């Protein structure tokens, strides 16, 4: 789960991390009111969307008068903001953050992630803040410094000081940087975050260290422990299809292709998508119905996939372990009839009650294309999507 910048800064503030004064605004008049409350002479008007690259896309403006705050708020609020993370369709801006201006001298980067290779929490830092860290990592990996943090000890003073020095924090400002890094770690740990990022971390002309941005991602499996984080959820920023899928306990992620995938098990789902791509196709979605799929869930899964206007074919790939193939067959038949399926459907089933499931499909009268192997299924669905 992602949250907005202003929400991330609320979290940082709770953990003692220095951030500029600012508030969210949901209208132009409210933006002006916030600016007047903060006082001048400089304000930053920021679009609030769940994507990076807002500045390059025109979603961050520096205002030097209340009139400019109104002008920029009017420009940004409601705009379709396109960044390298939104895709060409962009994301509509429904919220702003109005913040006091900052004396920017040195922009740094710091973040915390869970490293899958070491299975540890890793603190990363770079002297190249205020830009795309992915680009820095690709072109200048030597500028990315990493510290492995042991959960039993937390981020030690020496570790924080060492990283701060390596990324260029002046010696006199290292105690401030240490407090920010340790506060960021505590926020990451105590909220079950999967990412906590400050970009940029600013060192001002007088040596003050302050977080000018905040980005958090949270482990959705841990949200039951954090109702205060769930309260930050903004459904306007999420894919409507993914929201609908969650109501039926379906793991669904929209993709850019034209071949729908309905699979049981995340591993098999990823292997299915890889095999489709191997034979020249493009998956339209990741969809895991899980081990306890019912006829209703399968029907809803079909409805979700068919809402995609680019859909050209569907592949159902089932391994019947806990899940019985006859139950899936029943759902496929009911779902196909309920939605008046009008795209080619390829079905491959193996495992528990496989023969019964195949017989049910064969007797259904539906134009279902059967396959015995995953490779055969992928080849057939790619051909069907291409109209062959």
Curated annotation (Swiss-Prot):
Substrate binds at residues 264, 321-323. GO terms for cellular component: cytosol; succinate-CoA ligase complex. GO terms for biological process: succinyl-CoA metabolic process; tricarboxylic acid cycle. It comes from the Bacteria. The keyword Cell division does not apply. ATP binds at residues 46, 53-55, 99, 102, 107. SUPFAM superfamilies: Glutathione synthetase ATP-binding domain-like, Succinyl-CoA synthetase domains. It catalyses: succinate + ATP + CoA = succinyl-CoA + ADP + phosphate; GTP + succinate + CoA = succinyl-CoA + GDP + phosphate. Pathway: Carbohydrate metabolism; tricarboxylic acid cycle; succinate from succinyl-CoA (ligase route): step 1/1. GO terms for molecular function: ATP binding; magnesium ion binding; succinate-CoA ligase (ADP-forming) activity; succinate-CoA ligase (GDP-forming) activity. InterPro entries: ATP-grasp (IPR011761), ATP-grasp_succ-CoA_synth-type (IPR013650), ATP_grasp_subdomain_1 (IPR013815), Succ-CoA_synthase_bsu_CS (IPR017866), SUCC_ACL_C (IPR005811), Succ_CoA_ligase-like_bsu (IPR005809), Succinyl-CoA_synth-like (IPR016102). Its EC number is 6.2.1.5. Keywords: ATP-binding, Ligase, Magnesium, Metal-binding, Nucleotide-binding, Tricarboxylic acid cycle. It holds the Pfam family ATP-grasp_2. The keyword Cell membrane does not apply. Its cofactor is Mg(2+). Mg(2+) binds at residues 199, 213. Heterotetramer of two alpha and two beta subunits. Succinyl-CoA synthetase functions in the citric acid cycle (TCA), coupling the hydrolysis of succinyl-CoA to the synthesis of either ATP or GTP and thus represents the only step of substrate-level phosphorylation in the TCA. The beta subunit provides nucleotide specificity of the enzyme and binds the substrate succinate, while the binding sites for coenzyme A and phosphate are found in the alpha subunit. Belongs to the succinate/malate CoA ligase beta subunit family. This is Succinate--CoA ligase [ADP-forming] subunit beta. The lineage of its organism: Bacteria, Pseudomonadati, Pseudomonadota, Betaproteobacteria, Burkholderiales.
């Amino acid at each position: 789960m992602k949250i907005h910048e202003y929400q991330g800064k609320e979290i940082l503030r709770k953990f003692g991390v220095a951030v500029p004064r600012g508030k969210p605004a949901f209208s132009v008049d409210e933006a002006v009111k916030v600016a007047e409350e903060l006082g001048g002479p400089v304000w930053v008007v920021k679009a609030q969307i769940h994507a990076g690259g807002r500045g390059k896309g025109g979603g961050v403006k520096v205002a030097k008068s209340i009139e400019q705050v109104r002008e920029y708020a009017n420009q940004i609020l409601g705009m379709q903001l396109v960044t390298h993370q939104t895709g060409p369709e962009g994301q509509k801006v429904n919220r702003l953050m109005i913040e006091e201006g900052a004396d920017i001298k040195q922009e740094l980067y710091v973040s915390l992630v869970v490293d899958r290779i070491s299975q540890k929490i890793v603190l990363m830092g770079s002297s190249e803040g205020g830009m795309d860290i992915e680009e820095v990592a690709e072109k200048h990996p030597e500028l990315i410094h990493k510290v492995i943090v042991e959960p039993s000890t937390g981020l030690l003073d020496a570790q924080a000081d060492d990283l701060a020095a390596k990324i260029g924090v002046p010696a006199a400002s290292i105690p401030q940087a240490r407090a920010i890094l340790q506060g960021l770690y505590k926020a990451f740990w105590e909220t079950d975050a999967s990412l906590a990022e400050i970009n940029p971390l600013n060192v001002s002309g007088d040596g003050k260290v302050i977080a000018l941005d905040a980005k958090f991602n949270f482990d959705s499996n841990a949200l039951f422990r954090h109702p205060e984080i769930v309260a930050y959820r903004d459904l306007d920023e999420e894919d409507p299809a993914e929201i609908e899928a969650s109501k039926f306990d379906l793991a669904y992620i929209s993709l850019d292709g034209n071949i729908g995938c309905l699979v049981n098990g995340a591993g098999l789902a990823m292997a299915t998508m890889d095999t489709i791509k191997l034979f020249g196709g493009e998956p339209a979605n990741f969809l895991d119905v899980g081990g306890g799929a019912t006829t209703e869930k399968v029907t809803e899964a079909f409805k979700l996939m068919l809402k995609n206007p680019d859909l050209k074919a569907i592949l159902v790939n089932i391994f019947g372990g806990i899940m019985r193939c006859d139950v899936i067959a029943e759902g496929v038949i009911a779902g196909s009839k309920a939605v008046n399926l009008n795209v080619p459907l390829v079905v491959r089933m193996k495992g528990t009650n496989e023969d019964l499931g195949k017989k049910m499909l064969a007797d259904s009268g539906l134009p279902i294309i059967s396959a015995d192997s995953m490779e055969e299924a992928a080849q057939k669905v790619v051909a069907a999507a291409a109209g062959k």
